[in-house]
Amino acid sequence: SGFPNRAAFDQALGDAVAAVQPDWIVCAGYMRILGASFVQRFAGRLLNIHPSLLPKYRGLHTHAQALAAGDAEHGASVHFVVPELDAGAVIAQARVPVQAGDRAEDLAQRLLPREHALLCAVLQLAAAGRLAERDGSVWLDGQCRFSPLRLDCQGMLIP
């Protein structure tokens, strides 16, 4: 990797990100766990999309886990990133049905377009200045959200 240790990598990544002065940092398909120092440096500006209805199925192989559990539905979540894996406040979720005979690959393929729509909808809120994280909670339009927004069939977020 060209770095003597994880701390050096996190510092270099943080410096590269800080150099472009982003309003938001989005982890989409980034399959590495971010170090605590990086997460703390950009706290409240780091978003991740995760293929499960958090807090269910943190980490990898979420589609297979949903099938093994016999879940009737599966989904995706956009959440604020905190040092603990997939544990940040959930902003919004999208759901899909689990169908008889589904394999993990089928479920992943059915969910992917909903994940894309979900991430785009949340990023619209963020870019418009409507979204914030305070004290581990999601705030939308100056109001604390006690449950995640839901993506409807038209790709709109609803309470």
Where are these regions (language model features)?
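One-carbon transfer enzymes
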Residues: 1-159
